[in-house]
A protein has these predicted regions:
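Active-site bordering "gate/hinge" segments
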Residues: 1-342, 346-384
Length: 384
């Protein structure tokens, strides 16, 4: 090892300076490590085994989604807008379609509203199972990776039957959905959802009562109710800290007001509670899907016919939905053109990322993965 000591302001590379710190403090770069382009970096300062400072460094997968939307019309924006969260594509398109429908004064057919809700909840389960599987890797629990990755195929299969695509569906469009569901879909959907729910019940013994998960997540990264509200967290992170807030209940859209389900809330605020809320939410998704299948009109139109390149008025709208990670909103500014003048995407991942330094400071370094992924953070969505 070189014995050379650099002065505090010594420039090693353009824009890179070495900072003189206490001899006890070590700076660690966690990431970006990914077989693709790299997702995120977390800069940690540790004193022995304890984290004394955390500096998240997002932006490695920024693709300019908001700017891109200004150069495409309201319909051709759909395929690229779902890319930031490919495993929850229906829910990221949902607020966009609701906003454009408000701009254009469109009334969505009743049958399409129910099908949207079904697709949204199927996608929520697909995303949550993927998130849970990755959490298993973070915790060193291989079964927790394999089971969710296998069980999510039940929901992917249903979405494939509905939309013709396994992952990114481009299924929601302003004015309804792209196409109706196939014949006998209701029976297949009900059968697979019921089996999926039975599988979820087995997770309690194998995962949530498992000493591995409990020892890694209980009493780590505790976020109080007051701090959860103050930091602006959302979704499972907020509800794991005792705040009863779900947009499907508080600001219902389409036919969620008619659905029979409850909001899951826990008070512990630790990583264990944050890992459990999404699992409990999947049971409610199954309830919603069954209820929507029962109440859905058996026939009717599923899409409003639009003129090519429809134009909005000189106005602006904001619509938000409850995605698999929390509140996801779209702010659309229209100036009477076929494309948005401005599109701003408010994503839950970035809001929950704000809590990371608060939770990791003072924690042991070994607890970092468990706390980080419990925040339901999706790097690609945060960067947009």
């Amino acid at each position: 090892m070189s014995s050379q000591v650099y002065p505090k302001d010594k420039e090693i590379l353009p824009g890179l300076h070495l900072e003189k710190v206490d001899d006890r403090i070590m700076t660690l770069n966690v990431g970006p490590q990914h077989p693709g382009s790299g997702h995120m970096r977390i800069i940690l300062k540790v004193d022995g085994d304890y984290i004394v400072h955390c500096d998240p460094d997002p932006g490695y997968v920024h693709r300019g989604e908001e700017k891109m939307a200004e150069y495409r019309n309201y319909i051709t924006n759909i395929p690229h807008l779902e890319r930031p969260v490919i495993h929850d594509s229906c829910n990221i398109l949902y607020p966009y379609c609701l906003g454009v429908e408000e701009l254009l004064g469109l009334e969505v057919p009743e049958r399409a509203k129910y099908i949207r809700v079904i697709a949204s909840e199927l996608n929520r389960c697909v995303y949550t199972q993927y998130w849970l599987a990755i959490y298993g890797i973070f915790l060193g629990h291989s079964t927790m990776f394999m089971w969710p990755m296998g069980d999510r195929e039940l929901m992917i299969d249903l979405l494939d039957k509905m939309t013709g695509a396994r992952v990114t569906h481009a299924y929601f469009v302003p004015g309804g959905i792209r196409n109706d569901i196939p014949p006998n879909f209701e029976d297949v959907c009900l059968r697979q959802v019921n089996y999926f729910e039975k599988r979820l019940k087995e997770y309690a013994d194998v995962f949530y009562d498992n000493p591995i998960l409990i020892s890694r997540t209980k009493d780590t990264g505790i976020l109080s109710r007051e701090d959860a509200i103050k930091l602006g967290t959302t979704g499972s992170v907020l509800r794991a800290s005792g705040v009863d807030f779900d947009i499907r209940k508080k600001e219902p859209y389409d036919v969620y007001e008619e659905m029979d389900f409850q909001t899951n809330v826990l008070k512990e605020g630790d990583s264990y509670a944050r890992s459990k809320i999404p699992w409990l939410d999947m049971f409610e998704s199954c309830r919603i899907i069954r209820d929507a299948l029962k109440k859905m009109p058996k026939s009717g139109s599923v899409r409003v016919k639009l003129k090519p390149k429809p134009k909005g008025g000189d106005t602006e709208v904001y619509r938000r939905v409850e995605s698999g990670r929390g509140s996801l909103g779209m702010y659309i500014v229209s100036r009477g053109l076929p494309q948005p003048y401005r599109l701003k995407i408010s994503v839950p991942s970035f809001r929950n990322l704000i809590a990371m330094p608060h939770l990791l400071t003072g924690e042991k370094l070994g607890n970092m993965p468990a706390v980080y992924w419990s925040l339901n953070y999706w790097p690609v969505e945060a960067d947009r």
